[in-house]
Amino acid sequence: MEESLTQNLTESIKNVLGLKEISPAQLSPLVLAYIGDSIFDLVIKTYLLDTKGNMQVNKLNRFASNIVKAQSQSEMIGIIEPLLSPAEEAVYKRGRNAKSYTSAKNASISDYRRATGFEALMGYLYLEGEYERMIQLIKAGLDRKNRILSAKY
């Protein structure tokens, strides 16, 4: 049963909708960031359902927004960057250095670029089917951020 679950959402989407295989290496870093933004948001919302429980949706949304904003993603990549393989670091740097035609509303250019790199990495890992690695990196970032916050308060 576990294997059929990890057959995964991506495969189910492709099979049911009749989509072709996508090679993440052939996608632009901004396209990787586009899908990475969504998958990171989904992982964080799933995490919050467990850690915050059944609460008002607007409160859950505030918690999620605080974690998925560019500044937090920039902090998270700073935490996990030493854990990245050379290939993962290359994807992150491609995303960070990509020329974006949009700008952050509430973040510095530096944070926005680092967040774009983080999202590109998440998108790459997701499309490669490396879900466990993606979630391990997110967990490492969340654990460290939570320890820092706990020490402050």
Predicted regions and their residues:
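Double-stranded RNA-binding/processing signature
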Residues: M1-Y153
